[in-house]
A protein has these predicted regions:
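Conserved beta-strand hairpin/beta-sheet module of binuclear metal-dependent hydrolase folds
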Residues: 1-52, 154-165
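Short Pro/Gly-enriched beta-strand edge/turn motifs at strand-loop
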Residues: 2-8, 110-115, 135-138
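Short Gly/Pro-enriched turn/cap motifs at secondary-structure boundaries
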Residues: 12-13, 123-124, 144-146
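Residue-level marker for buried hydrophobic side chains located in beta-strands
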Residues: 31, 60, 83, 161-164, ...
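Short catalytic-loop micro-motif centered on adjacent basic/acidic residues
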Residues: 31-34, 58-61, 142-144
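Active-site HxH/HxHxD metal-binding segment of metal-dependent hydrolases
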Residues: 37, 42-43, 47-132
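Metallo-beta-lactamase
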Residues: 37-38, 139-146, 150-217, 224
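Charged, glycine-enriched surface loops/patches
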Residues: 135, 222-228
Length: 228
């Protein structure tokens, strides 16, 4: 799994369909944001961690979709790393029946069949009023970005790089998609528009771009809003 430098101690692991931010607390201690697909990304993610001799200190989760939380429980068990996610998404993540809340078109039987790997129990819950979370003395900002899912959040690394999860997707993803994935359209539109008022040196889109130019970010926000 390739590792891209974003800025400072912030990196992004290139998973099968997403960028997974990695923040280096030290040369060996890291925080991972989102975990990719269970089947597609587990081997590569494990190899990346082990080959670099990293100690996984925490997992931060943007939301409970299978391409983001597919390896949380596995990483909790393998490395003893605590996982944090927003209150709403923590409840959704507990078991396949509750996970279905983010995939309402699926039957209960189908959700139990395909979502066993994606379910986990959060070690820390991020509440709606929380604007940060501290990991080993490093402060990560929390961005409230609901809409794509009910409790979707983003994170700002101590370097100031903003991970916006699925609040925005890149132009290639927009062009390739048949329909937008938005659970609450009005909130999603508000969250996308709210990013205009932010000013970070880098924005990491899970799917699948790093943006450092303000004009490019503005154009991408326009495209995402138009797509909805």
């Amino acid at each position: 799994m390739e590792l891209l430098h974003v800025l400072g101690n912030t990196w992004a692991a290139v998973a099968a369909t997403a960028l997974l931010p990695v923040y280096k607390l030290t040369d060996r201690d890291v925080v991972l944001i989102d975990t990719g697909y269970a089947k597609l990304d587990r081997a590569g993610l494990t190899s990346l961690i082990d080959a670099n001799g990293w100690r996984l200190r925490a997992i931060l989760c943007s939301h409970a979709h299978f391409d983001h939380t597919g390896n949380v429980r596995y990483l909790q068990q393998r490395y003893g790393a605590p996982a944090a996610i927003s209150l709403i998404e923590a409840g959704i993540s507990v078991n396949p029946d509750s996970y279905r809340a983010n995939y309402v078109a699926l039957t209960y039987g189908k959700s139990r069949e395909i979502f066993l790997e994606e379910c986990f129990t959060a070690d820390r819950v991020i509440f709606p009023q929380d604007d940060h979370i501290d990991i080993d003395g490093a402060r990560f900002g929390v961005l409230s970005l609901p809409g794509h899912s009910a409790g979707h959040i983003g994170f700002v690394t101590p370097d100031g790089a903003a991970y916006v999860g699925d609040c925005l997707i890149d132009q290639h993803e927009i062009d390739a998609a048949k329909l937008p994935t938005s659970m609450f359209i009005a909130k999603d539109l508000d969250s996308k528009a709210a990013l205009r008022a932010t000013d970070y040196p880098a924005y990491i889109l899970a799917h699948k771009q790093i943006v450092t130019d303000r004009a490019e970010l503005s154009a991408l926000i326009d495209s995402n809003i138009a797509f909805i």
